[in-house]
Regions:
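Short, well-structured alpha-helical segments
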Residues: 17, 89-93, 389, 422, ...
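A short alpha-helix-loop-beta-strand transition element characteristic
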Residues: 431-437
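ATP-dependent adenylate-handling active sites, centered on carboxylate activation for C-N bond formation
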Residues: 8-11, 120-125, 133-136, 140-141, ...
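Cysteine-centered catalytic environments shared across enzyme families
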Residues: 1-296, 318, 322
Length: 509
């Protein structure tokens, strides 16, 4: 994982220059060119020997936080000159040098946020991947023509007020002389899916196995992380490895529902599994650290991030693993949230699925990326592969809607979300995991008797006389100022509840 900041017409302080360092700890570099300063902090994943950024060639400068999985194919397809480094990201520089345009972005298969400067045209170009897996913030000070593009909010001085997330799947061109936007374009072009849903997800995992560093999997025991782990194990076995080579990790409080199912999945798959159990106090006391690193005050995002943050910290401190697979994004792509059962119509379900994906950069994918990368690890998120998303969402919505669990009796809860996905992968997991009802990670880290959401609400009311949301905002504002980082409060739809926890829904069992 890497972090970068680009400063236009701004004399940066070292604190601001190096605030992105928490996203990458192998190397840091600063480059000043024309009226721009580039700061880059690198964690080597591919190209561990020589992948130093910023890349500079023929008056073109590039910084990129990302992984381009099809870089070898692009070098061959476009007859590009050989890479000067082993970094997959350098293909972006090579493509721009050849075509002097941004039309190539739709060909990039991966996750990325990058900034590219052309000294000949004086244009700064910055872009973000389809679903915003990699973070990118933009800040302007219009009165003085100052501008900052950065992986982290920590790069922005308190005097800069006009700060926002870069829209996912967009590319922007800035005239660095006038500090004006010349174009803001959605680069994504949808293609007809060439793979089945099953093959697309398997291929999504397979290409993300590209790494020169050890690989592990977050395994909560839910469908999503368990399915990704199963595919990782199967691909590793095909390559001559052993299931026990794959390390899996879970976390929770005493009695956490996830810990039980994570062990069932790990035993079935044969992975080397580690689980950590912490008391409530450990979860609560780390919330300020979590808010600092995820750069959000959204309630459900903070709740879910604590477990993610703790397990990532432990992986960093106790293993040599640098790349971590996760199951995030499946609920947005596959209408997996429990409230989906209450959708009034298939049309409403379809609109909600599109809405969730359009805004995932502010919520679930933010949680996963920030919690993991803040500990110097690389998050791999196969469910947000653009080809898999395209394949899955091309299936008729009637097939993707919640359906009856196979073999369920009339007395049982029969509707289950992600039914279509589960059917594609029968045999990949034990049935009690494959057909396990949705349990949000923010809920599964706790027991049913003492749910995480009630623990937090009671704690803040008793200790501070404030709501959970008020406390989170105060912590965030004290660190970053009053920046509107979320467009709305995440809440379940079609439900009679005032809390985002799925355990407050009538359909929760």
């Amino acid at each position: 994982m890497c972090g970068f900041s680009v400063f236009l017409n701004y004399e940066p302080y070292l604190r601001e220059l190096f605030s992105a360092e928490k996203r990458g700890g192998d190397e840091s570099r600063i480059l000043k060119i024309d009226n721009l300063v580039f700061a880059f902090h690198r964690l080597s994943i591919n190209g561990v020997d020589d992948g130093s950024q910023p890349f500079v060639k023929d008056g073109i400068v590039l910084v990129c936080n990302g992984e381009i999985y099809n870089y070898e194919h692009l070098y061959e397809k476009h007859d590009l000159p050989s890479s000067h480094t082993k970094s997959d990201c350098e293909v972006i520089l090579a493509l721009y040098r050849k075509y002097k345009s941004i039309d190539f972005i739709n060909e990039l298969d991966g996750v990325f946020a990058f900034a590219l400067y052309d000294t000949h045209t004086k244009q700064l170009i910055y872009a973000r991947d389809k679903y915003g897996v990699r973070p990118l913030y933009i800040g302007f000070d219009k009165s003085s023509s100052h501008m900052i593009v950065s992986s982290t909010l920590g790069a922005f001085p308190s005097s800069m007020k006009d700060i926002s997330q870069m829209e996912s799947s967009f590319v922007n061109l800035i005239d660095t002389v006038t500090c004006r936007s010349m174009a803001n374009i959605n680069w994504y072009r949808n293609n007809h899916p060439s793979l089945s849903v099953k093959d697309a997800l398997i291929f999504s995992v397979k290409k993300r196995l590209m790494s020169e560093r050890p690989i592990g999997c977050l395994l909560s025991g839910g469908l999503d992380s368990s399915l990704i782990t199963s595919i990782v194990v199967r691909e590793h076995l095909k390559n001559g490895g052993k299931a026990s080579d794959i390390r899996t990790f879970s976390i929770g409080m005493k009695g956490a529902t996830d810990l039980k199912y994570a062990k069932i999945a790990a035993d079935f798959l044969g992975t080397t599994h580690t689980s950590w159990e912490y008391d409530i106090g450990t979860f609560i006391k780390n919330i300020p650290n979590v808010i600092r690193d995820i750069e959000s005050y959204d309630i459900t995002t903070v709740r879910a991030s604590v477990g993610n943050w703790l397990v990532s910290r432990n992986i960093r401190e106790t293993t040599d693993i640098k790349v971590v697979f996760n199951g995030d994004g499946a609920d947005e792509v596959c209408s997996g949230y429990l409230y989906s059962k209450n959708a009034p119509s298939l049309e409403d379900l379809q609109k909600d699925q599109e809405h969730l994906l359009d805004n995932i950069q502010y919520f679930d994918v933010l949680r996963s990326d920030r919690s993991i990368s803040s500990h110097g690890l690389e998050a791999r998120t196969p469910f947000l592969d653009k080809d898999f998303v395209n394949a899955y969402t091309s299936v008729d919505i009637s097939k993707r809607a919640p359906k009856c669990v196979p073999g369920a009796s009339s007395e049982q809860e029969v509707d289950i979300t992600k039914w279509y996905l589960r059917k594609q992968f029968e045999g990949y997991l034990p049935d009690e995991v494959l057909w396990r009802n949705k349990e949000a990670f923010s809920d599964g880290v706790s027991s049913c008797e003492r749910p995480w959401h009630t623990i937090l609400k009671d704690h803040y009311k008793k200790s501070y006389g404030k709501t959970e949301e008020e406390v989170y905002k105060e912590i965030f504002f004290s660190m970053y100022g009053d920046i509107p980082v979320i467009p709305f409060k995440w809440m379940p739809k079609w439900s009679d509840t005032d809390d985002p926890s799925a355990r407050t829904l009538k359909c929760y069992t």
